[in-house]
Amino acid sequence: MKQGIIKNVKIRHVAAGDLDACFTIESTCYTTDAATREKIEKRIAIFPAGFLVAEANGQVIGMINSGATNKDDITDDAFKDMADHIHDGKHIVIFSLAVLPAFQGVGISRRLMDMFIEASRDLKKEKILLMCKSGLISYYLKYDFLYAGKSKSTLGGFEWHEMYLPFVFDNGGQS
């Protein structure tokens, strides 16, 4: 059944009506580091261009969301509350990439990441930045992210690692 779902998955920008589903995904896939419903609502309202969902048969089953900034230091936890979000910032910062457990393992997170990377390029961002746990470093390396080192963030009581994906545009340089 899972394999058949992937054919029916549509990746699209978030809509206000997706809030409850996105909060369910966030709270199911994350523990003490999960964003609150209010934070997700704020991300949807402030930066829908940086928020994609995966939908199968009318159900939102996965998401990726972000904010934009001119800062290189993304360890300030207030940023996840969109405190320093700048729509036209040079960097886009991934906050969450999550797929409901029943739909994991069939390429949905890959489709979300591929579309997110394409959308970030279209927005002319210089880099995608993120923090991840140790177990996800190899996942992001598959997308050509570079490892920047251990983060000073201790969000949720976890050890985090910083990674980034620089973009090179047609003019031969970065944007």
What are these regions (language model features)?
Residues N8-A21:
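A short beta-loop-alpha structural element at the N-terminal edge
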Residues H13, T24-R37:
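Helix-loop element at the rim of GNAT/NAT acetyltransferase active sites that forms part
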Residues R43-F47:
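Short loop/turn motifs at secondary-structure junctions and domain boundaries
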Residues G50-I64:
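Conserved beta-hairpin
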Residues V60-A98, Q104, T154-E159:
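Conserved acyl-donor/pantetheine-binding loop and adjacent beta-alpha core of acyl/acetyltransferases
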Residues A68-K71, L129-M131, L141, L146-E162:
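Conserved catalytic-core motifs of GNAT/GCN5-like acyltransferases
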Residues V99, G105-E118:
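Conserved acetyl-CoA-binding loop-helix of GNAT-fold acetyltransferases
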Residues M113, A119-K133:
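Conserved GNAT acetyl-CoA-binding A-motif
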